[in-house]
């Protein structure tokens, strides 16, 4: 179950960078912590540098293509205290490499 969720998260992260212009994608939450994971656990991703205009459409596309609920948050809108938690506990899945 964990391997499947991690694989899906990596696929989503790569798609966000390549197709939607994200600069960095960080996995956080239960999948990143690898505990209390259930079959229906959502995938939590913090995304930096992605344009805000199409944000909700992109979330919907990810849900449709992956078949799993995705909680996508824009890095730029997070409070500093939550950014610190994501940086400390999260896993960097993809970045644009520039």
Locate each region found by the language model.
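Catalytic core of pol beta-like nucleotidyltransferases
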Residues: 1-24, 32-39, 48-98
């Amino acid at each position: 179950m964990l391997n499947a969720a991690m694989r899906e998260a990596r696929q989503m992260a790569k798609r966000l960078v390549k197709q939607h212009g994200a600069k960095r994608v960080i996995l956080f939450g239960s999948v990143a912590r690898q505990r209390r994971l259930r079959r229906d656990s959502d995938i939590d991703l913090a995304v930096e540098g992605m344009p805000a205009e199409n944000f909700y459409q992109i979330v919907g596309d990810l849900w449709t293509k992956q078949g799993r609920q995705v909680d996508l948050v824009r890095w730029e809108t997070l409070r500093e205290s939550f950014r610190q938690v994501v940086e400390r506990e999260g896993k960097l899945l993809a970045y644009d490499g520039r």
